């Protein structure tokens, strides 16, 4: 089994409820969405293993990734992207010698069914202002994904909402309410450099039905990957 990867590296988690835990990051190439604020390349001829200081030709073998997982001293293995669900079969082929932490845009419900074994799910709820085509269809797929990968005693699932300067607070509130029973909490994440006043007002409304926190991309402030 092989997969197209952008990079492999060890660092701390810089987003969401688990900020600061040490993780092995496996960043997949390719995404089914095109959010205007995305800062990750979609394709790469090579995969950079930044911790091992190696350059690998894509696609990278599951055996290589498994070796990196087994040798790492980390809290968990973070599968990120891109969109890791596009290569769900690759993730499913790996052995969980460390807990698996999935970061996903939550728009591929059929793929989500193959990843129920993940221990942590950091799932996105995209806002209309992200500039996606067929937004209403995307949102319905997101609801289905959260239902498949809902929070349980064995799987910790939360929702991250990336917010630009301008967004429809009522629509975000109503969308979050639809998935509140599938997550243990929400993270409102400002697009890097955005103002937060409107986000703080939204948080005040959302805490009526869920643990809701405003958390920026901390790794960018620290200057780490």
UniProtKB/Swiss-Prot annotation:
UniProt: [4Fe-4S] cluster binding residues: 31, 35, 38
Name of the molecule in the record: 7-carboxy-7-deazaguanine synthase
Pathway(s): Purine metabolism; 7-cyano-7-deazaguanine biosynthesis
Note on cofactor: Binds 1 [4Fe-4S] cluster. The cluster is coordinated with 3 cysteines and an exchangeable S-adenosyl-L-methionine. Binds 1 S-adenosyl-L-methionine per subunit.
E.C. number(s) listed in UniProt: 4.3.99.3
Organism: Archaeoglobus fulgidus (strain ATCC 49558 / DSM 4304 / JCM 9628 / NBRC 100126 / VC-16)
Residue span(s) of domain Radical SAM core: 18-225
Family: Belongs to the radical SAM superfamily. 7-carboxy-7-deazaguanine synthase family.
Entry annotated with the keyword Transcription regulation: no
